[in-house]
């Protein structure tokens, strides 16, 4: 499984892990999120976002509008 893509046979039909059997860590470059083809529970719309890392910040890019946001992070000890 070192040189293959893993993807479901049909859209929005399978989960990766369960509440009882979770993956320990996910190692990825950018994180691409989309619920296109369905709606969210808050306002009934759909979105498409990418989370990217900077040197000192995390950024959220709205792929539908092109708007970019910076996460407001507060250091904790």
Regions found by a protein language model. Name each.
Residues 1-57:
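Intrinsic low-complexity, repeat-rich intrinsically disordered segments enriched
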Residues 57-74:
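Short, surface-exposed terminal/edge motifs of secreted or surface/virion proteins that either
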């Amino acid at each position: 499984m070192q040189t293959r893509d893993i993807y479901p046979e049909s859209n929005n039909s399978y989960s990766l892990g369960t509440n009882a059997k979770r993956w320990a860590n996910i190692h990825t470059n950018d994180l691409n999120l989309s619920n296109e083809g369905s709606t969210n529970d808050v306002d009934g719309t759909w979105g498409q976002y990418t989370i990217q890392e900077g040197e000192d910040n995390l950024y959220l890019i709205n792929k539908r509008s092109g708007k970019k946001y910076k996460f407001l992070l507060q250091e904790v000890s």
